[in-house]
């Protein structure tokens, strides 16, 4: 019997609260230890979900069967497939962050490059899919550059006040020594809005205390959903039962191959046994009442049909309840149009849209921290005007998109028309490029019409509303001559 059937249900990770008056400006080590103790009660859940993703399922922890019995341990890694498919579909295309102020937009782009932010985002998405939530942690390096990294909820937690606003009072990043004389002892850091304190072996180290440059807790929680439930957590029991059934099916196949041959009503000598094994033939004769002799294999009743039905139903339920499409299913091959494919991915898209709202909220909080440093951004409130654009990573029917955009000509604005095309990443930049090319074409046409009369060409273009210089018209003419 699988351990999942005997497991006491655990609680989902709710926020930790405190009375801010009891904590004061900084928590004591005793208070921190108490919250670490509460946090460690959640580690069992985190470790179980992590082991599912890594492929170490309960089937491998079942008691061994007798040596003479087949004992296959087969595990299908649905959790990893579900997680990686969801992450690739929803966030394989990096989140695009933009701002109306070009200087701010350039600074954000530099921050993303320095931190390989698309990879950090993907790690946070993966952690949220596994554990239900995760943390983005900001810090300043030796060059006073802002860095960001992804933390799992196994190593970091935050404690909030018990007011309606639920402000963060302090956070703890901790671990335990794994080797040496201090094996098992706690070490880490305590973060408050004003201070960062370090501790080791159960005591705070005063000489390492430093001011918190951010003025607030420099970490932001990312949530897959409001209850912090992992993506494959609702189907963990189904997955364990699927593994158990598949393993028993493998055992049945082995048992069938090793079935015992029973000879009833006749005596078989040793030399005859060898002959039967080598020639795979049974021929009994010269025995009294030979007609009553019976030769047959001893096998247990086959439940192959029942097992197959159960496996098929479990597989359908796993994808259905996890709300992640099985893209390897044969039915996906018939989804030739974009609309048909979108319908098949409808449930997954709903989960992605819900998660997108949570991500946008977390990103805005994170960039609020980032904007608090004048070296990053000249405006502390620049995060309010940031725009976060999410795009699903899905095969596109470019001909279908182009036909739709062409048919929409005259019904919608040019910008909206261009936004219908997935291969146009920035409609505004594309419109600017189109306008620039149009002006260049008309400049060349004007010069050609006036036989090289630059002054006349400039006058015509200015009358048409274009701002061009004599030099630009001459350069365009020289390019045309060179091409000829």
Where are these regions (language model features)?
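Extended, helix-rich architectural segments
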Residues: 1-147, 478-484
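C-terminal helix-loop subdomains that flank or include functional centers
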Residues: 274, 278-289, 306, 313-484
């Amino acid at each position: 019997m699988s351990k999942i059937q005997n497991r006491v249900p655990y609680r989902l990770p709710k926020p930790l609260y405190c009375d801010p008056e009891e904590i004061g400006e900084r928590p004591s080590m005793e208070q921190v230890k108490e919250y670490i103790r509460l946090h460690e009660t959640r580690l069992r859940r985190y470790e179980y979900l992590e082991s599912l993703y890594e492929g170490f399922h309960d089937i491998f922890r079942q008691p061994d069967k007798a040596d003479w019995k087949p004992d296959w341990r087969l595990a299908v890694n649905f959790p990893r497939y579900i997680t990686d498919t969801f992450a690739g579909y929803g966030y394989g295309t990096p989140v695009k962050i933009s701002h109306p102020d070009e200087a701010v937009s350039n600074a954000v782009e530099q921050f993303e490059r320095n931190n390989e932010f698309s990879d950090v985002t993907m790690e946070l998405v993966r952690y949220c899919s596994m554990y239900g939530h995760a943390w983005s942690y900001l810090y300043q390096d030796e060059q006073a550059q802002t860095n960001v990294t992804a933390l799992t909820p196994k190593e970091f937690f935050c404690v909030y006040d018990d007011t309606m606003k639920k402000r963060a009072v302090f956070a703890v990043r901790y671990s335990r020594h794994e080797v040496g004389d201090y094996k098992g002892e706690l070490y880490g850091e305590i973060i408050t809005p004003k201070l960062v304190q370090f501790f080791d072996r159960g005591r705070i180290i005063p000489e390492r205390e430093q001011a918190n440059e951010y003025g607030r807790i420099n970490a932001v929680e990312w949530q897959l959903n409001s209850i912090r439930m992992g993506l494959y957590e609702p189907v963990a029991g189904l997955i364990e039962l699927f593994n158990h059934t598949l393993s028993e099916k493998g055992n049945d196949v082995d048992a069938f191959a090793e079935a015992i041959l029973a000879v009833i009503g006749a005596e078989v000598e040793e030399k005859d046994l060898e002959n039967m094994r080598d020639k795979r033939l049974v021929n009994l004769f010269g025995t009294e009442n030979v007609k009553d002799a019976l030769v047959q294999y001893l096998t247990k009743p086959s439940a192959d049909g029942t097992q197959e039905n159960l496996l098929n139903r479990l597989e359908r339920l796993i994808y259905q309840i996890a709300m992640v499409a099985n893209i390897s299913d044969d039915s996906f091959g018939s989804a030739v149009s974009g609309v048909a494919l979108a319908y098949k991915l409808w449930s997954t898209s709903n989960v992605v849209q819900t998660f997108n709202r949570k991500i946008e909220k977390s990103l805005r909080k994170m960039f609020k921290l980032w904007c608090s440093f004048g070296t990053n951004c000249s405006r502390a409130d620049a995060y309010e005007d940031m725009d976060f654009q999410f795009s699903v990573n899905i095969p596109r029917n470019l001909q279908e998109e182009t036909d739709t955009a062409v048919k929409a000509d005259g019904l919608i604005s040019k910008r909206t028309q261009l936004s219908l095309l997935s291969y146009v990443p920035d409609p505004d930049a594309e419109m600017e490029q189109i306008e620039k090319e149009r002006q260049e074409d008309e400049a060349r046409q004007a010069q050609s019409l006036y036989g090289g009369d630059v002054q006349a060409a400039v006058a015509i273009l200015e009358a048409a509303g274009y701002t061009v210089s004599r030099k630009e018209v001459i350069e365009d003419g020289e390019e045309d001559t060179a091409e000829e």
